[in-house]
Amino acid sequence: MDFYYLPLSAPCRSVIMTAKALGIELNKKLLNLFEGEHLKPEFLKINPQHTIPTLVDNGFAMWESRAIMVYLVEKYGKQNDPLYPSCPKKRALINQRLYFDMGTLWKSYADYTYPQFRENKPADPELFKKFESALEFLNIFLSQSKYAAGETMTLADLAILASVSTFDVVQMDLSKYEHILRWYNMLKDTAPGAAENWAGCLEMKKYFKK
């Protein structure tokens, strides 16, 4: 199972943690976006959208991290796997959190920070307010349950952990979010693949400081 990735990418790290939780060995293929390796013809044949992470499982190629995470559990997980249980209501809640991470939490972080370290633009206070709003939503979610989508660890936790650990390593102030901190301190060192996730965060920090 070939896995095209960059360690500093939070979406890539969420897939790595999912694979670790399932006991799946990934054949990791480093793809250096900064050198344009994702635009080479051989990779475009695999993924015409030229994004990472990309997974190739016995000739079947797919991308988008959260879709990959769900695929891995559905194909290789246990029946009614706690990471993504078969109950429609439980799955719906996990899906909501996954889409929240993609479309609100991570997006607001990227919208705020990427112009600063990619284009050397000043911080935009309005974009920071949107990021804070996303953190407040997450804090509310985590005030209602032990984990991101209920009382057991699910794919939602692994996706959001990849995001929040990135916020941590670039020194975003999370101190006023009591429930995020409780959850993060519980998982940051104990989640499957936590060490590799943090190593990728440290790579991200180097890039952020450039």
Curated annotation (Swiss-Prot):
Xref: Pfam families: GST_C (PF00043), GST_N_3 (PF13417)
Keyword set includes Transferase: yes
Reaction(s) catalysed by this chain's protein: RX + glutathione = an S-substituted glutathione + a halide anion + H(+)
Alphabetical keyword list: Transferase
Stretches assigned to the GST C-terminal domain: 87-208
All residue ranges annotated as the GST N-terminal domain in the record: 1-80
Record carries keyword Cell membrane: no
Chain ranges passing through the membrane: none
Enzyme Commission no: 2.5.1.18
Superkingdom classification of source: Eukaryota
EC supergroup of this enzyme: transferase
GO molecular function: glutathione transferase activity
Family assignment from sequence similarity: Belongs to the GST superfamily. Theta family.
Assembly and interaction partners: Homodimer.
Function in brief: Conjugation of reduced glutathione to a wide number of exogenous and endogenous hydrophobic electrophiles.
Name of the molecule in the record: Glutathione S-transferase 2
